[in-house]
Amino acid sequence: MFLHSLHLQHFRNYRDQTVQFQAPKTILLGENAQGKTNLLEAVELFSTLRSHRVSRDRDLVQTGAESALLTAVVERDSGEQQLQIQLQQQGRRRVQRDGEVLRRQLDLLGSLCSVQFSSLDLDLVRGGPQQRRDWLDRLLIQLQPIYAHLQQQYGRVLRQRNALLRRAESLDLALLAPLNWQLAQLGVHIMRRRSRAIQRLVPLAAHWHREISGQREQLIVAYQPSVLAPDDTDEAIAWQERMLAQIEARRAAELGQRTSLVGPHRDDLNLSINGTEARLQASQGQQRTLVLSLKLAELELIEAVLGEPPLLLLDDVLAELDLRRQQQLLEAIANRFQTLITTTHLSAFDQSWVETAQILTVQSGHLQSEAVPMAPSSASLHKSLDS
């Protein structure tokens, strides 16, 4: 897939800006707080319907405006599509595909897929379980759009159950029973999908980590569900029964802490290098190699599942990589993946990145083309991405 254009109206600090993407790699150059990351955030919204920065739509609407309108033109193997998201200061968002209003915004998922890599992604290694769950969930939403619906349902049941647990002194335990069953049913659906995604991702990530580390390091990614699958299987009914039993066993603790302690909202991933937990022992260089390996694995997995390459969004991260890791990334993506890159300066880049990129300067929500060393037609670009 190839993102041909993006039109932002009253989105963040963009009043009315159109950008045409004319090369497989686009570098967004500018000082901090000028709008580079905001542009990547717009692409992220089309990919996942979420922002990793804020949870409320009104925080994305430009100050003084009632709504923001984002329009993307995307080339897919099946043809060109126009996607639109309208965000409101008040009220629900509105999404369209090719002029048709979608009754469920989740139906837009899968139209434009992307993998984002920023300096914040180092939290995958050194941060808490929530960061690792969020990363896995963003991947799954693009691989299986139904996953977003499961998450919504699970979140609703979890909130209802926690609201009851907060009334521990006067709680009628019979009210928990139907919510326990729903939590187990939906929770197992989520854990099964997470488990299967990790099984497919592990060999890809391990391969890239060996390559980047010069065959010196072995990466192991292990899924740690809140409730272990019975007998090393993911058979749904048996897994649900085990989760219900664990909920019953933790009842006193849940009443004491007034929150749900069992379910996929307590899952984690264990990342280890050569048998040692990366969170505790990995150097900064090893952490960067690990996260880069995960991101390259994401790209490959999405391409394998969808049959088309996703976009790669690099948010001020290349400066965090030494030239060797930059070269590994450059060789891995070549022209297969359309790449949008933000940076404050070009000096830390491998020169081959600069020579083959479209360069746009970003200043206070305005974009200006600096150089387009290669200016092939859209058709030839799409052909190069598919070759």
Swiss-Prot record:
PROSITE patterns: RECF_1 (PS00617), RECF_2 (PS00618). Keywords: ATP-binding, Cytoplasm, DNA damage, DNA repair, DNA replication, DNA-binding, Nucleotide-binding, SOS response. It comes from the Bacteria. GO terms for molecular function: ATP binding; single-stranded DNA binding. One of its GO terms (biological process) is double-strand break repair. InterPro entries: DNA-binding_RecF, DNA-binding_RecF_CS, P-loop_NTPase, RecF/RecN/SMC_N, RecF_2. It is found in: Cytoplasm. The keyword Cytoplasm applies. GO terms for cellular component: cytoplasm. The keyword ATP-binding applies. ATP binds at residues 30-37. Belongs to the RecF family. The RecF protein is involved in DNA metabolism; it is required for DNA replication and normal SOS inducibility. RecF binds preferentially to single-stranded, linear DNA. It also seems to bind ATP. This is DNA replication and repair protein RecF. The lineage of its organism: Bacteria, Bacillati, Cyanobacteriota, Cyanophyceae, Synechococcales.
